[in-house]
Amino acid sequence: TGAIEYLENNGFTGPVLMSNQTYQQIHYKPKNTMILDSTAPELSLDGELSLRWGRTGHCAGAVWYYITVDGKRLFFSGDYRENDTFYRCDAVRGLTADLAVIDSAYSRMDRAKDMRKAVADAAKDALSASAPLLLPVPSYGRGLSMAMLFYQTFGEAYPIHMSAKLRDQWLRIGHRSYFAHEEIL
């Protein structure tokens, strides 16, 4: 989403497709925005062009795209995380594509459980030693996942405090559980 303003300033005038949550989160609003309908994750524009999309498990609003044009299939996804503690993911297993573009800054999924345990163990060690624990996180994405991880790990033993913006996001997502797991809201 960070390149949209740059692209439009350099002549791009086409539609920009995104989820409603993403639109709410970004500062620069594209001139020609198309909002995805969460009740219709598949769209056939004509016989030669179809679009399917799903949640990536990265943050509220993050989606992957599966586009078919003239019989060719393209898969695009930013960060993708199955089994996230907070966010839902629509698995992409079984999809095949002629071209896949994947921007993934996180560790492999087979290491995610061990990585979360190591983070929780380090936090527990610090808290048990009465050390302060401050975790600067982005306003969207892993901050809520980490809060959920710590709550699942520590329960009520250590209270979790978060910025007003992060707390507001938690409450806002709680009214619409489309991107977050229902059992945690």
Task: Please provide the spans of the model-predicted regions.
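Feature recognizes metal-dependent phosphohydrolase scaffolds
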Residues: P159-I160, F179
